[in-house]
């Protein structure tokens, strides 16, 4: 009887221990993985682009604290490699883009495998000298064509109010002083591109030294083949002076983090 009782006790202890281990394992698996956003920028570029990037780092660090994701930044573009990008859900390019073949290849691989990207202003700059056809297609087949000068505020029209990116901005809002880029061809005709915000035609002509006289000038769009958003804003120290535009930046980041592809 004593042996039988002992076996029963041992069996009970084993079952309890197994249940405890399973419970701990399930609890660990149930914990949500903290998402990580990594911002790239350069300090050796145009001063107004550096100012924007430094302000953006502070802005998105504050957004991270509010929304509970990890945020880090780097000025070393060699961090654009598979090892460093492992576990990163979203990349930000604040004022430039990669230049070396290895950096570009790492970014292409990251995006083709479902990575996320949000680029600002000069991060989308490309022309015939850039020599990166993949990136032109990534932006929707569009190439930088010109800009206004000096930086000026502009009225923006929201093309899609149903998007999670634009849900907290009005149909029309004033954006702080910025250097606005023109694109040729416009990315809009591309069936894979979703234009979210456009420079309002009531702004034309905009500029003094260099002028945008008219035309279709998208300023925020996504290539739906990827988890990405391009924003033309990003020149100077006034970009974060608009609460409406700040909500746009915050919601765009959240939207990209929550998308799956």
Kindly give the residue locations of the regions a language model identified.
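Bacterial N-terminal signal peptides
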Residues: 15-25
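Extracytoplasmic/secreted proteins, especially bacterial periplasmic and envelope-associated proteins
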Residues: 55, 59, 102, 106, ...
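Catalytic beta-strand/loop cores that center a nucleophilic Ser/Cys/Thr
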Residues: 145-225
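Helical hinge/lid and interdomain linker segments adjacent to catalytic or ligand-binding clefts
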Residues: 31, 38-127
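Extracellular ligand-binding/catalytic regions of CAZymes and related secreted enzymes
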Residues: 31-41, 51, 59-62, 66-69, ...
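Bacterial N-terminal signal peptides that target proteins for export
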Residues: 2-17
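A glycine-rich, often tryptophan-bearing local segment used as a flexible ligand/cofactor-contacting loop or short
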Residues: 97-169
